[in-house]
Curated annotation (Swiss-Prot):
Highest classification ranks of the organism: Eukaryota, Metazoa, Ecdysozoa, Arthropoda, Hexapoda
Single Gene Ontology MF annotation: adenine phosphoribosyltransferase activity
Domain of life where this protein originates: Eukaryota
GO cellular component entries: cytoplasm
Pfam families hit by this protein: Pribosyltran (PF00156)
Principal location class: cytoplasm
Family indicated by similarity: Belongs to the purine/pyrimidine phosphoribosyltransferase family.
Descriptive protein name: Adenine phosphoribosyltransferase
Pathway in which this enzyme or protein is active: Purine metabolism; AMP biosynthesis via salvage pathway; AMP from adenine: step 1/1
Gene3D superfamilies documented for this protein: 3.40.50.2020
Length: 182
């Protein structure tokens, strides 16, 4: 942990490292890229601290941290190891071995499928879902449905960045927290 720096200062530092790419992936889109922050060791530590501290305060009952394919994976292991919790991935179709449950969800350009290993979460376990971005909310809705299919209980969805204008939060039930809102 980095106790000598305030949470606000840590967040400001992380924000300063997020890249902005106009007209990517298509004309008229301003793409905000978390990888700029992840290439900076200090920003990585601050980001971990902010996520972990939030879960300690908001979801201390959490037992499993689930990361969404693929950028959510960058955070769930960091958080889980710091808190001494289990972690599990939700992956795109065909990427997980063993018995899985699946759910289809809509994208702005089509349909995709998420999968979760049936053994990853025990019935009744309390789960925090982590991803880099909340946009339309489709992936977090699908993740919540998958976790429910294996008997897990989502206690919170936690994202690094939220694109508020897309109103994805309105599609989600339960607690949702974003570190940065655009």
């Amino acid at each position: 942990m980095s106790p000598s720096i305030s949470a606000e200062d840590k967040l400001d530092y992380v924000k300063s490292k997020i890249g902005e790419y106009p007209n990517f992936p298509k004309e008229g889109i301003l793409f905000r890229d978390i990888f700029g922050a992840l290439t900076d060791p200090k920003a990585c530590v601050y980001l971990r601290d902010l996520l972990v501290d939030h879960i300690r305060e908001s979801a201390p009952e959490a037992e499993v941290i689930v990361g969404l394919d693929s950028r959510g994976f960058l955070f769930n292991l960091l958080i889980a190891t710091e808190l001494g919790l289990g972690c599990a991935p939700i992956r795109k179709k065909g990427k997980l071995a063993g018995e899985v449950v699946s759910v289809e969800y809509k994208l702005e350009y089509g349909i995709d499928t998420f999968e979760l290993q049936k053994s990853a979460i025990k019935p009744g376990q309390k789960v925090v879902v982590v991803d880099d971005l909340l946009a339309t909310g489709g992936s977090l809705v699908a993740a919540t449905e998958l976790i429910g299919k294996v008997g897990g209980v989502v206690v919170e969805s936690l994202v690094v960045m939220e694109l508020v204008g897309l109103e994805g939060r309105k599609r989600l039930d339960g607690k949702v927290h974003s570190l940065i809102k655009y």
